[in-house]
A protein has these predicted regions:
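C-terminal helical cap and adjacent loop that interface with cofactors, partners, or active-site loops
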Residues: 128, 132, 211, 236-239
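Short, small/polar residue-rich loop motifs at catalytic or cofactor-binding pockets
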Residues: 199-201
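Short, surface-exposed loop or secondary-structure junction motifs
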Residues: 1-189
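Short, gly/Ser/Thr-rich active-site loops of penicillin-recognizing serine hydrolases
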Residues: 136-139, 150, 155-163, 224-265
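Short, well-ordered beta-strand elements
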Residues: 205-206, 212-221
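Solvent-exposed loop/turn segments at secondary-structure junctions
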Residues: 28, 222-223
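Composition- and surface-driven signal marking solvent-exposed, interaction-prone regions
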Residues: 42, 133, 146-147, 217-219, ...
């Protein structure tokens, strides 16, 4: 509640819609409060009943149950020395340096709490399962988890490619997820219809309707600048190159990220 009170009292730094700037943590508390007020449930209960339980995922929720904590992979600060730019960048994005961010995310108190934009614990398989559900128009094993219209509207672009004033890189957003771009974007080359999210340092999860794939890359090595960057770029390149595009009539559903589809708008 104290976080919400601080956010309610915060003054805008620019008129709404003037600048593109990702809210890594703060916006989650506002959206989380909206969900709680509309549904009358806390976020854990809502996610459990809406997604986690019907998709048979034992851990896909905010925080981590005590019985799974011995199995969790802890984060580790890696890459070039943080003072060579990483700390300055993460202070700008998160409000704290690399080691502080790593220490906070490894703390059992972080696993106890609900951080609406920052602490879903899951596995790569379960994250991939979630994006497969989105690719299937919200359907999973005969159960309709989300409506096709919800997914379509969530993937409608809200911006073109612009420099994000928080992340300081070219970004493109939909109403819900981050979007890929052509000729190259967050999820690799020619991923203009892909949608997903960038997590805390070297975590990428997305679905690409053009290629009929979902991808989940979860890493514990936390760095911004390091020798991993060429390999990461090559991985994204190879996924785009090796996974061929499929004809539109073979896709599982309609998505707002496809500029040719306007039937549900």
């Amino acid at each position: 509640r104290s976080i919400l009170r601080r956010l309610y009292a915060a003054r805008p730094v620019s008129p709404a819609g003037n600048h593109l700037a990702y809210h890594a943590v703060t916006a989650g508390y506002i959206l989380g409060e909206i969900i709680e007020r509309v549904t009358g449930q806390d976020l854990r209960q809502f996610v459990h009943e809406t997604i986690e339980k019907p998709m048979d995922m034992p851990y896909f929720n905010y925080g981590l149950k005590p019985e799974y904590r011995a199995e969790v992979a802890l984060n580790c600060a890696t890459g070039l020395h943080p003072r060579l730019g990483t700390d300055h960048y993460l202070n700008h994005v998160l409000g704290g340096g690399l080691q502080l961010a790593v220490d906070v995310t490894n703390d059992s108190r972080f696993m106890d709490t609900i951080c609406p934009a920052g602490n879903i614990y899951t596995s790569a398989e379960q994250a991939g399962r979630f994006f497969e559900m989105l690719l299937s128009g919200g359907s999973y094993q005969g159960k309709q988890i989300l409506s096709e219209k919800t997914i379509f509207r969530a993937t409608l672009p809200t911006t073109g490619v612009n420099i994000d004033r928080t992340l300081l890189i070219p970004m493109r957003y939909a109403l819900g997820p981050m979007l890929g771009s052509n000729p190259v974007g967050l999820f690799g080359p020619m991923t203009g219809q892909a949608f997903g999210h960038l997590g805390f340092s070297n975590i990428l999860c997305w679905a690409d309707p053009e290629r009929d794939i979902s991808v989940s890359l979860l890493t514990t090595g936390k760095s911004v600048v390091g020798t991993h960057l060429p390999a990461l770029a090559n991985l994204l390149y190879q996924i785009s190159i090796q996974c061929p595009r499929i004809p539109r009539d073979q896709r599982r559903s309609l998505f707002g990220s496809d500029s040719h589809e306007t039937d549900l708008v």
